[in-house]
Curated annotation (Swiss-Prot):
Compositional bias ranges of the Polar residues kind: 42-53
GO cellular component assignments: ribonucleoprotein complex; ribosome
Single GO MF annotation: structural constituent of ribosome
Gene3D superfamilies assigned: 3.40.1370.10
Role description: One of the primary rRNA binding proteins, this protein initially binds near the 5'-end of the 23S rRNA. It is important during the early stages of 50S assembly. It makes multiple contacts with different domains of the 23S rRNA in the assembled 50S subunit and ribosome.
Protein name in UniProt: Large ribosomal subunit protein uL4
Domain of life of the organism encoding this protein: Bacteria
Subunit structure: Part of the 50S ribosomal subunit.
Family designation: Belongs to the universal ribosomal protein uL4 family.
BP terms from Gene Ontology: translation
Lineage: Bacteria, Thermotogati, Deinococcota, Deinococci, Deinococcales
Length: 201
């Protein structure tokens, strides 16, 4: 059981969150699955049937003294088709739901163990970039680290969206990959409840 400190304008409190021990292999599986799902898979090459070449045999089979060849579209010639080249496809695959949930919980645990998790009881920002920068400075965020902010508050998202070192995600978009690729995690306390439910299922 992890105790997470929550900061707020009316003082602090703690939240008890059941987090597992970090397992690098499971985190690797989840991150690899996420990255595979994000791949566009648009790489495409033309086969010998698709290149703009005549299908006519270059010269007769015998009598020229040259090597025997068919048409000019074969992969052995410059400008010919590609043998076994890539075609558009999906690189995504299925990962068990419990493994995905465990990966998210372990990513949260990793940030909590390293003292890189900040939970907030309402940001109380006015939508201005200046107000976010001021709030961040008061809470030890000076721009030297990349910060992931998870909240559904529209004013907070507007305040932070123009800050180069901050990334804002909605609560529903919380995922292991984005947590791990940022140095710090700043999360709205209300987002920890659905995260706990996700872990416990």
């Amino acid at each position: 059981m992890a105790q997470i400190n929550v900061i707020g304008k009316n003082g602090g409190r703690t939240i008890d969150l059941e987090l597992p021990e970090v397992n690098a292999a499971i985190l690797h599986d989840v991150v690899t699955w996420q990255l595979a799902s994000r791949r566009r898979g648009t790489a495409s090459t033309k086969t010998r049937a698709q290149v703009s070449k005549s299908g006519k045999k270059m010269y007769s089979q015998k009598g020229t003294g040259n090597a025997r060849h068919g048409d000019r579209g074969v992969p052995t010639f410059v400008g010919g088709g590609v043998a076994f080249g890539p075609k558009p496809r999906s690189y995504g695959y299925t990962l068990p739901r419990k493994v995905r949930q465990l990966g998210l919980a372990m990513a949260l645990a990793d940030r909590q163990d390293g003292g890189k998790l900040i939970a907030v009881d309402g940001f109380d920002l006015d939508g201005k970039t200046k107000s976010f920068v001021s709030w961040a400075a008061q809470n030890g965020l000076d721009g030297s680290e990349r910060v992931l902010i998870v909240t559904d508050d529209a004013q907070t998202r507007q305040s932070a969206r123009n800050v180069a070192w901050a990334t804002v995600l909605p609560v529903a978009g919380l995922n292991a990959y984005d947590i791990l690729r940022h140095d710090r995690l700043v999360i709205d306390a209300v987002a920890l409840e659905p995260a706990q439910e996700e872990v416990e299922q």
